[in-house]
Structure formats: C-alpha cells, structure tokens
C-alpha cells in the first residue's frame, strides 16, 4: 500500500521520486537561550559561530562528509526570545561570524540550515500587537501559551515574517532555511477581522514554502510541505496509538524515503542509543544529534531544559562511529523502502528498492534467519544493495 501511495504522490508531483537523498548525518547545534529571571534577563551561550566552525573542522578531520548542520537559536536574543528577529546574535559572533561559518560550510560540502519558526511570536517582538497580528479563539482572545509569552501569528503577520526571513538570511551567504512550525501544524483563525479556515492557512503555507525556494527544509513533514522540501526535520517516529493497531509500521517513512532525507529523534536524547540506532535503520532515517560546545548544565536556569547530554567533546567519537557504520556497509540513504515485515515478535525485515535487505532484532535473544544469526538487540545486513556493491 505504501508503494502504491508513493507512486501516486510522484505522479501528483508531490514527491519527486529521484530515488536518492543527500544527508549522511545531521547535527543540530544549539546556540543559546535567555535566562529566566524577574529583574534581569541574561543569555546563556552554548555554541558560538566560531565554535560551530571548529566543530565542523573536527568532523572533517575525522573523515565525516556530507553533513547537514542546523543552527537553532542563532537569532538575536537566542532561542525563544525574539522569534521573528532574523539578525544573528552579536554575542555568538554576529553577522560577520555567521557569514564566515557559512563560507566554511560551503567550501567543505556541509549543508547549513538556519532554523526559524515564523508561526510563533513573542510579546516583545518588533511591532507586535496582540489581537492585530495574532490568531484569536472563538471568544476573540489571542491564542497563547500558559505563561502568555508566545502567540500564534495570523496569516498577514506570518507572511510578513517569512518574506522578512528570506530577505535577511540571504545577506549571510548560501545557508538554506529550515522552516519550523508551518510544516507540522495547521490552524484556523476565528478573529472577527482576519478570520481564516484551516484550508486557507494550508494554502498560505504552501505558497510560502514555494517562495522559499527549492532548497528549503521543513520540520514535521506534513503532506503539503513535502512538495517543496528536500529535507524533513524530526519526522514522526511514534504511532497513532489506535486501539485497532497491533504493530508499529513506519508508514510515513516508507512513503517518503528515497525522495527526501529526514530525521526522527536525536540519538543523545534517547535513553538507549543502540535502540535508537536500530530505529533509525528500520525507519530509514539519517543519524541525528543535537549538540553544543558547552556543557548543557548551563541551561538549567532557562526554559530550554531538554538537553541533558549534548557536549560535543563527549559525543564526537560516538557520532563518528555511527557515521562510518551508516555510510559503510550499511548504506541506506538511497532507494525506496519497498517492504517492512515482522518476522517474529520484535524481529523486523526491511527491504529497499536497491536490493538491500536488513533484519533487525529488538529481542534479548539471537534470531536465526535463513541460516544467518541476527544477534540480540542488533541487526544483520542479509543482502547488500547496488550502492553498497559499488563501494
């Protein structure tokens, strides 16, 4: 069924069907975030632009090529402070530092993505006016979070944000945009003066992705975003948890793999890196880590507390090992996923259009498949694909 649906999307020009993707490993570099305080708001810097350049140089020396690097919280004020500011934070190195990093990335085959979220705005953002620029609920009140710090941009303000981002970020070099928010959430606006149905917002999202250019990336990966995005950040790894489901099938990934690169969950946020690695293989996802130059303990007095272990010096060796594993004998970045089958319990067979066949064993005991032993909590490449044979 996934194969048939993929072919349908290709015929509809929603997927390009190029049967190949580019990213080998994805690193999200978290730059910084404001502190939480009543009287003084400081800035915690976890990675500067020069730090990022040094980190990329380290991976280059280790032979890690084809990196996709996402900068998160690079704007003025850091992550979450001034979401619609598209000027680089001066304390991270400013415009000069970002342009230098951009040049280094371009010269060394690294794809650099600047993450933005034009859908969310904060109370102190530019000429932000509650009610005029925000989405309203049925009672006419602005839609906001529990702390009333963030609001959702209405269609007029959203469009201004994206066009502003395209203009500003173009000044910093060849970096592409990763547009968060609008690729994963569709909402309506019930305001009396600027009402919009969900389908109208979706049409706007599509037009904004189209204006952003062919090298735009998106988060979440809703269907309308796939047509315009060649990379999807954090595609769904979970299921709908419906009571009628008795098995987890990577339906989304089976449809998309081979047309777009995508990530699922970060390796350094998983309680078991080996388990997450198996999930990447099963789902055809690119290895993905969110890292920092500094120890993430510095984030304890901020609103960004989900990073428990991210210091690059601690993760570099593991990242390099996984890169070599995924891009050596296990090369699954290209080709459609044409079959996903449960062999027994938590033992899965995945087949690719390239001819590759992989058996993943999530159980605590070895599994015998066609005379091959698949070790417990491990995988075995049963048949190599055409790409692997050429290497």
Residue ranges of model-derived segments:
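Aromatic-lined carbohydrate-binding/catalytic grooves of carbohydrate-active enzymes
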Residues: 20-160
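Short loop/turn motifs at secondary-structure junctions
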Residues: 63-66, 172-174, 178
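Hydrophilic extracytoplasmic domains
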Residues: 1, 47, 102, 166-170
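Active-site-proximal substrate-binding groove within the catalytic cores of carbohydrate-active enzymes
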Residues: 108, 118-121, 125-175, 183-391
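Conserved beta-strand positions
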Residues: 69-72, 179-181, 218
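Intrinsically disordered or highly flexible coil/loop and linker segments, enriched in small
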Residues: 14-15, 65, 111, 332
């Amino acid at each position: 069924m996934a194969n048939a649906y993929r072919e349908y999307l290709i015929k509809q020009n929603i997927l390009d069907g190029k049967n190949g993707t580019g990213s080998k490993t994805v690193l999200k570099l978290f730059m910084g975030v404001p502190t939480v305080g009543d009287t003084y708001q400081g800035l915690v810097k976890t990675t500067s632009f020069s730090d990022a350049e040094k980190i990329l140089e380290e991976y280059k020396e280790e032979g890690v090529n084809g990196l996709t690097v996402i900068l998160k919280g690079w704007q003025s004020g850091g992550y979450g402070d001034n979401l619609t500011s598209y000027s680089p934070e001066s304390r991270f190195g400013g415009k000069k530092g970002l342009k230098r990093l951009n040049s280094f990335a371009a010269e060394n085959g690294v794809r650099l993505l600047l993450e933005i979220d034009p859908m969310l705005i904060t109370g102190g953002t530019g000429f932000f006016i509650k009610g005029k620029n925000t989405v309203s609920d049925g009672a006419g009140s602005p839609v906001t979070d529990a702390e009333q710090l963030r609001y959702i941009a209405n269609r007029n303000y959203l469009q201004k944000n994206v066009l502003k981002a395209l203009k500003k970020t173009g000044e910093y070099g060849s970096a592409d945009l990763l547009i968060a928010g609008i690729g994963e959430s569709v909402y309506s606006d019930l305001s009396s003066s600027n009402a919009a149905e969900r389908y109208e917002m979706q049409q706007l999202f599509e037009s904004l992705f189209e204006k952003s250019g062919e090298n735009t990336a998106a988060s979440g990966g809703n269907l309308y975003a796939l047509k315009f995005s060649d990379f999807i950040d954090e595609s769904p790894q979970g299921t709908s948890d419906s009571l009628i489901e008795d098995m987890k099938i990577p339906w989304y990934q089976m449809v998309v793999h081979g047309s777009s690169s995508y990530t699922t969950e970060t390796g350094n946020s998983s309680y078991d890196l080996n388990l997450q690695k198996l999930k990447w293989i099963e789902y055809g996802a690119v290895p993905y880590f969110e890292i920092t130059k500094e120890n993430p303990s510095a984030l304890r007095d901020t609103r960004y507390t989900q990073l428990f272990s991210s210091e690059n010096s601690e993760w570099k060796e593991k990242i390099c090992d996984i890169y070599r594993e995924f891009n050596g004998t296990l090369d699954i970045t290209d080709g459609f996923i044409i079959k996903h089958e449960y062999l027994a319990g938590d033992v899965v067979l995945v087949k690719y259009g390239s001819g590759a066949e992989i058996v993943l064993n999530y159980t605590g005991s070895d599994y015998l498949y066609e005379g091959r032993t698949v070790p417990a909590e491990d995988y075995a490449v049963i048949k190599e694909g055409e790409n692997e044979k050429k290497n």
